[in-house]
Amino acid sequence: MQVSVETTSPIERVLTISVPAARVDEKVNSEVAKTAKTIRIDGFRKGKVPVSVVKKRYGQGIRLDAVEQIMRDAYVEAIQKESIQPAGMPSIEPKNFAEGADLEFVVKIEVYPEVTLADNSAIKVDRVVSDVTEADVDTMLETLRKQNAEWSAVERESADGDQVTIDFVGYLGDEAFDGGAAEGHKLVLGSNTMIPGFESGILGAKAGEERTISVTFPEDYQAENLKGKEATFKITVSEVAEQILPELNDAFVEKFGLEEATVAALRAEVRKNMERELNQAIKSKLKNALFEGLSSINEVEVPSALVDQEVDALRKQAAQQFGGQGFDASQLPAELFQEEAKKRAKLGLLISEVIKKDDLKVDDDRVRAFLEDMAQAYQEPQQVIDFYLKNKEQLAQVQSAVLEEQVVDKLLESAQVTEVTLGYEDAIKPNAQAEEAGEEA
């Protein structure tokens, strides 16, 4: 077998492969003989069909199947011989497969790029510094009280924080529009769950009162036919209710199933959970910043096959999150995910190179610590740990996450790090919101 390799780009190769006719004939004759032993033809007993008859009737189809198999086998031999690492499926095009002649075919493939990492000292990141204060715990306890609040009907004008029960119909001009009506809708004033101007238009209304308000839909509203449009809503208020918060006492604490039903025990549990959430948020922000920095200082040509894999993964993720059961992820256009997919594929190549360059291996002690920390959020931590340790697929995901943490540590050794102090609420916000808070401070 002869192989020639042409480099058409840093991530593309063209292989021209020639297989001797004798090897092809041997494969064809072997397949014909196998077929003769199993095929049924009228006038012949099973297994007694002459090879010449099989060749005459089925020879062309058998030869085509044999040629396809030889091309696949020869392709694998060729990439092993030439030490080529494909990044995706090959495109195989036969050039000559005439009987009696050498089989010739061309293979076009994408390969993994050679990655040369830039100096990590060029990476600049902010490391968030924050802690949980007593005031933060008080705020969280107040949130718990609100989540367990009851609503009591009142005979007064509605105010911010009240819950109103309303019927409404929306109009564009004189025509009611689809999706713009509801009956018995419960709305907490000040929650900002409706478009701007809707909630403020109900402030001060009493039960039984009717109001007509004018609003303008935002330019970025999800419904295309309503973006930027002026609309009128006719609203009937059937009830105004005020929030009745439960007392923060031992009776309230009993709802949470703690071993010790005291306010002090609840404060301790709330603080522990907040500190866990805060630490996870800080680690996540730092990891994301380091990975963004790693990507920004390195140029890598990304094989389209890797981008396509990420597009498929993002499609499935979006389908699970928004589509519900039975939703066909392939309906979502690839263009929606192309940019993010390319970023992820590039980052994956860079992380792999860091692991390879620094010879990083999964730290089993860190895997155990990762599992123990994660399991603390569950009622039976040991059961969670045992589940992961006994499930190879789940354990592999944890090991991958730990290896990413080790990459983060390696990048931190040389990156330029600036500490930024944030309060708890700002520290746990997504990156963009936290950056805005930091700028305002």
From Swiss-Prot:
Q: Which family does it belong to?
A: Belongs to the FKBP-type PPIase family. Tig subfamily.
Where does this chain mainly localize? cytoplasm
Q: Name one GO molecular function term.
A: protein folding chaperone
Catalytic activity reads: [protein]-peptidylproline (omega=180) = [protein]-peptidylproline (omega=0)
Residue ranges of the PPIase FKBP-type domain?
A: 161-246
Q: What is its EC number?
A: 5.2.1.8
**Pfam families for the chain:** FKBP_C (PF00254), Trigger_C (PF05698), Trigger_N (PF05697)
Annotated protein name in UniProt: Trigger factor
Q: What gene is this protein translated from?
A: tig
InterPro entries xrefs: PPIase_dom_sf (IPR046357), PPIase_FKBP_dom (IPR001179), Trig_fac (IPR005215), Trigger_fac_C (IPR008880), Trigger_fac_C_sf (IPR037041), Trigger_fac_ribosome-bd_bac (IPR008881), Trigger_fac_ribosome-bd_sf (IPR036611), Trigger_fact/SurA_dom_sf (IPR027304)
Any one cellular component term from GO for this entry?
Answer: cytoplasm
Q: Where in the cell is it found?
A: Cytoplasm
